[in-house]
Swiss-Prot record:
This is Large ribosomal subunit protein eL40. InterPro entries: Ribosomal_eL40_arc, Ribosomal_eL40_dom, Ribosomal_eL40_sf, Ribosomal_zn-bd. Keywords: Ribonucleoprotein, Ribosomal protein. HAMAP family: Ribosomal_eL40. PANTHER family: 50S RIBOSOMAL PROTEIN L40E, LARGE RIBOSOMAL SUBUNIT PROTEIN EL40. Pfam families: Ribosomal_L40e. GO terms for biological process: translation.
């Protein structure tokens, strides 16, 4: 069931989608991270996301 309430959409984006992914080991890291928590690499990218329902 898609989320339509704008307040809930903001919560979902913050809790689920706003993460950094380590390019070296693939670990998910918090949005404010500068280094990977698992391998200590600084090669992080934002998680790719599109908010919407399944196709």
């Amino acid at each position: 069931m898609p989320v339509t309430d704008p307040e809930l959409v903001a919560i979902v984006q913050k809790r689920v989608l706003k993460k950094y992914v380590c390019r070296k080991c693939g670990a998910l890291n918090p949005w404010g991270a500068t280094k990977c928590r698992r391998c200590k690499s600084t090669n992080l990218r934002p998680k790719h996301y599109e908010l919407g329902g399944k196709r």
